[in-house]
From Swiss-Prot:
The keyword Repressor does not apply. Its cofactor is (R)-lipoate. The glycine cleavage system is composed of four proteins: P, T, L and H. It comes from Staphylococcus haemolyticus (strain JCSC1435). The gene is gcvH. The glycine cleavage system catalyzes the degradation of glycine. The H protein shuttles the methylamine group of glycine from the P protein to the T protein. Is also involved in protein lipoylation via its role as an octanoyl/lipoyl carrier protein intermediate. Residues 22-104 form the Lipoyl-binding domain. This is Glycine cleavage system H protein. One of its GO terms (biological process) is glycine decarboxylation via glycine cleavage system. SUPFAM superfamilies: Single hybrid motif (SSF51230).
């Protein structure tokens, strides 16, 4: 199972790619595998504020609906609109095509609370 080493991870199975003061957020390969085939993705609008630990959207699979939890706080600067028409990207390409949102960080110190790839692998039993 892919757990890219350059990313950070939340305990709620979101991944975070840090690029300066902006982060890209998605869900992990492990999470999409647990959910099954994704049929719908609901994401916030550009300029929405998200807060660490709060829900910022959801993914619906054939099995269940799962909330997305913000691993950091900040302002949404981009939302992946392709997922509206192609939610299957979450299953096919969780780390590339299926990023969820890009967020301008309001508190960079929150990144310190995230897990490294090794810590995340340990958490999921890899």
């Amino acid at each position: 199972m892919a757990v890219p080493s350059e990313l950070k991870y939340s305990k709620e199975h979101e991944w975070v790619k840090v690029e300066g003061n902006t982060v890209t957020i998605g869900i992990t390969e492990y999470a999409q595998g647990e959910l099954g085939d994704i049929v719908f993705v609901e994401l916030p609008e550009v300029d929405d504020e998200i807060n660490e630990g709060d829900t910022f959207g959801s993914v619906e699979s054939v099995k269940t609906v799962s909330e997305l939890y913000a691993p950091v706080s900040g302002k949404v600067v981009e939302s992946n609109e392709e997922l509206e028409d192609s939610p299957e990207f979450v299953n096919e390409s969780p780390y590339e095509k299926a990023w969820m949102v890009k967020v301008e960080l309001s508190d960079e110190s929150q990144l310190d609370d995230l897990l490294s790839a090794d810590q995340y692998k340990e958490m999921i039993g890899e």
